[in-house]
Amino acid sequence: MDNEQLQKLTEDISLQDFGKPFRHRAFFNDRLKTTGGRYMLSSHNIELNRKYLIEHGRSELVGIIKHELCHYHLHLEGKGYKHRDKDFRDLLQKVGAPRFCTPLQTKKTQKKTYMYRCAACGQQYIKKRAMNPERYACGKCRGKIKRIF
């Protein structure tokens, strides 16, 4: 599915389920990592995560589009468009849109850890960020620090 097909699908869902036209742009944003989609308040455009279409299929994407269209139509009408607002929750229930999307199953890359050891006393240091061991000394004995991995 490309952006033109997504635009057409969004316009069709808006007319069928909401009875109102969608007059802005809907497109895939490949930079989205964890969210299914987002409604942009300033431009009124809807950005969607292509990974949800690939992993969960068209039905999940339709649910995300409905969710974002709830934000869209309520915001344009001047009603409560935030997740906690009653207007938003009522409209979600009316159109059958999910409140949250199914989490992605793709594996998250494990953060790299760095291990350092004092050459004198053997004190170990595990860090999430790399450091230059020549600039630091052991906090226990002031000995030299060596990088293990």
UniProtKB/Swiss-Prot annotation:
InterPro entries: SprT-like_domain, SprT_Zn_ribbon, Uncharacterised_SprT-like. This is Protein SprT-like. SMART domains: SprT (SM00731). Keywords: Cytoplasm, Metal-binding, Zinc. Its cofactor is Zn(2+). Binds 1 zinc ion. Residues 6-147 form the SprT-like domain. Belongs to the SprT family. It comes from the Bacteria. The lineage of its organism: Bacteria, Bacillati, Bacillota, Bacilli, Bacillales. One of its GO terms (biological process) is response to stress. The keyword Cytoplasm applies. Its main location: cytoplasm. It is found in: Cytoplasm. The keyword Cell division does not apply. Zn(2+) binds at H67, H71. HAMAP family: SprT_like (MF_00745). One of its GO terms (molecular function) is zinc ion binding. GO terms for cellular component: cytoplasm. The active site is at E68. It comes from Bacillus velezensis (strain DSM 23117 / BGSC 10A6 / LMG 26770 / FZB42).
